[in-house]
Structure formats: C-alpha cells, structure tokens
Amino acid sequence: MMSEPVRVGLNGFGRIGRNVFRASLHSDDVEIVGINDVMDDSEIDYFAQYDSVMGELEGASVDDGVLTVDGTDFEAGIFHETDPTQLPWDDLDVDVAFEATGIFRTKEDASQHLDAGADKVLISAPPKGDEPVKQLVYGVNHDEYDGEDVVSNASCTTNSITPVAKVLDEEFGINAGQLTTVHAYTGSQNLMDGPNGKPRRRRAAAENIIPTSTGAAQAATEVLPELEGKLDGMAIRVPVPNGSITEFVVDLDDDVTESDVNAAFEDAAAGELEGVLGVTSDDVVSSDILGDPYSTQVDLQSTNVVSGMTKILTWYDNEYGFSNRMLDVAEYITE
C-alpha cells in the first residue's frame, strides 16, 4: 500500500521556491499544499507560468487564491503573510515547511513555522545564528538525521561537492583539497554597478567574472567531519543566470590514474549515490545541464592526474538539482 505524500508548506516563491514547485510536479512522494509569498496573486500566477531559465509551464494559473496546473492534481492555496506564525500550516496538516525566503535562516526564526503548525522545517540555505542547525546533504549525511525539528538543506554548492568528496575520500583518501565553483550569478548581485557589502559583488553581474567567497568548503567539513582542516575554496561568479561547475583539485593518499578515479564515480553513480551523483562523457556545456535533477554530475572527460594531483570538474544546475534534494530530504525526515 502506497504511503501518503509528504505535505509541504512552501514559504517563498523566489528562485528556489519556483524550482521546488516545478520539481514537485514530477514527484508522487511530495505535494505542495500551500505557498506563501509577499507577491500578489497576479505576480505568482505570472512566475508560475513563465521563467527565463526553465521556460514556460503551460496551464499554471492562480484563480481565487489557488495555484493549479492543468493536466495535474496540483492544487496549492496562496497566502501573503509576512509573519510565519500566522500561516495556516496547522489547518493544512503540513508535514514539512520549506523556508525558502532567505530571511528566516536562524533556528529561532525558522521555528516560527512550528508555531504555525508544521511538524518539521527545512531551510533552503545554509543556516545562520549561534544556535546550531544540522545541515543535511542527501546521499552524503542525511542518514545522520536524528529527529530534529529544524534542519537545513545546506547550499547548492555543498550539495555539489560533498558527494564527489565522499567518493574520493572513501576510495582513495583525501589529504588536502581546493575547490573553485564557477557559479551562475544570483539575486544577491547587482544588475548594474551599485552598493553591496562585498566590494566585487558591487559590479554588474551579467558583465563581469567576479571572484568572491563561498562557504561550501567549510560546510563540506561539517557534513564530512573527517575532512576538517583539509579543504578550502572560493567562488567565481560568471555571467550566466543558471548552471554552474565546480573544479575540485585534491591531493589523494593513493596513487591513482584518471581511469581509477572515473571508475569510482561511475560505480557510485550506479550504486549508493544513484540519483544524486551523475556522470557524463558527453561534450556538454553549462546550458546542457539546465533541468538536471542530480546534485552533481562529474565531467569524466575533464578528470586529470598530474604528479599526484587530481582535478575533477563537476556540473550542477544550482537551482533545480538543489530543489530536488529538498524533496528528498523532506521525504526522509518524515519517514
């Protein structure tokens, strides 16, 4: 007998919220029953149907405060609360609230969804604040979930790099590693030159290659504590709206060849990391991996070993892949 789908209340209909919405249309295990955003109904109606990256979703519309999609069973009430405690999660019998506004990232703030009646909260970003929130990367450490009411789905880059690091460390041992994520620009950057707390991010996102920071290396060592002190990294924001790639250069304990490394990834992709880590030998570029549901997809052609140093390139749709893991984690923490 099939179990009931996980009932999700979605707070935030921005980039991740809209990707979660679209990903949910392909899932029998998770259903979105309510969506909250400060946008009015007409804006939600528009963004549900039209997207510059994902294209048009025909049949998506908001009528009388309900979002539906023709040809599907999707039906979610639309709300416009600024206070999460006022959301009708109790009335909607919400199992997991997805906190996807980017605003309520501390444990205390995210817990307002519990006050509103949700059983669990999953934050769609790395957590903030002094009170710790466990970061779960599906396929890597999700089995360490221990009943916490509030957890984080980490970041898209952490979801990209940790499956790769897990395979390399378990198979060959990692002595040290440096990662560089060549990352699509995001809404935190400027369309035109303008003020920003990080000087280089003051420059126009679609006109510049912008070196900046990433918390992915530190987060990776929280997810894989055996790598503490062994990893560091940075980001380079580039003029594409979506589709990213991480370069991971590691000093491995074992002597390896490119074939050894690629075989390990192929085995993982067909085994314990199936659906999370993918591999490709095709001549793909960033636009080719848009809509890819994997957390990460290793570019096997680019694997290189020189004098004991190993370089991996791994692709990821930094919006849609991450959003699919939100669904996976939600299902896991409600089992």
Curated annotation (Swiss-Prot):
Catalytic activity: D-glyceraldehyde 3-phosphate + phosphate + NADP(+) = (2R)-3-phospho-glyceroyl phosphate + NADPH + H(+); D-glyceraldehyde 3-phosphate + phosphate + NAD(+) = (2R)-3-phospho-glyceroyl phosphate + NADH + H(+)
Annotated keywords: Cytoplasm, Glycolysis, NAD, NADP, Oxidoreductase
Binding site residues for NAD(+): 15-16, 37, 301, 318
Name of a matching Pfam family: Gp_dh_N
Pathway: Carbohydrate degradation; glycolysis; pyruvate from D-glyceraldehyde 3-phosphate: step 1/5
Positions annotated as active site in the UniProt record: 156 (nucleophile)
GO molecular function: glyceraldehyde-3-phosphate dehydrogenase (NAD+) (phosphorylating) activity; glyceraldehyde-3-phosphate dehydrogenase (NADP+) (phosphorylating) activity; NAD binding; NADP binding
GO biological process, one term: glycolytic process
Compartment(s) where it occurs, according to its Swiss-Prot or TrEMBL record: Cytoplasm
Protein name according to UniProt: Glyceraldehyde-3-phosphate dehydrogenase
Organism (species): Haloarcula vallismortis
Native organism taxonomy: Archaea, Methanobacteriati, Methanobacteriota, Stenosarchaea group, Halobacteria
